Amino acid sequence: MIEGIYEVMPEKFNEALKSYLKSTNEVVPLQDHDIMKTGEGREQAPIEEDWYFTRMASIVRQISIKGAVTSEFLAKRYGSLKNRGCRPSKYVGAYPEIGESVLENLKNMGWINEHPKDMLTEKGKTIVREIIEKVRE
């Protein structure tokens, strides 16, 4: 876990990291990210045009808190209730392809590695610490 991650508001941290990720041109979103739903429980695609960067920032925050995450964990974490009509709602996970794509982007950027205990590399940790310091001010 990175020091100070709990001392900043998650919304402000995610917003600052999202703007940083958008400014670097290293992120390659999914091909149909503008029209695809994020999970089986969703009825429509996200309204925000930059939802992929928001999800990516949120996943980086989860990695910095938990240490290591999998695409199955991310699918469960970002899932939702599916409206099944008159039957009771049922919790379904998000599409794991989104989490896999984000993890692949972070690997290509050099922010994470495959180590099971600590996924963030030194480059990723320094960027997250810089964002935390920027949000604290």
UniProtKB/Swiss-Prot annotation:
Belongs to the eukaryotic ribosomal protein eS19 family. This is Small ribosomal subunit protein eS19. One of its GO terms (molecular function) is structural constituent of ribosome. It is found in: Cytoplasm. The keyword Magnesium does not apply. GO terms for biological process: ribosomal small subunit assembly; translation. Keywords: Cytoplasm, Ribonucleoprotein, Ribosomal protein. Pfam families: Ribosomal_S19e. Component of the small ribosomal subunit. InterPro entries: Ribosomal_eS19 (IPR001266), WH-like_DNA-bd_sf (IPR036388), WH_DNA-bd_sf (IPR036390).
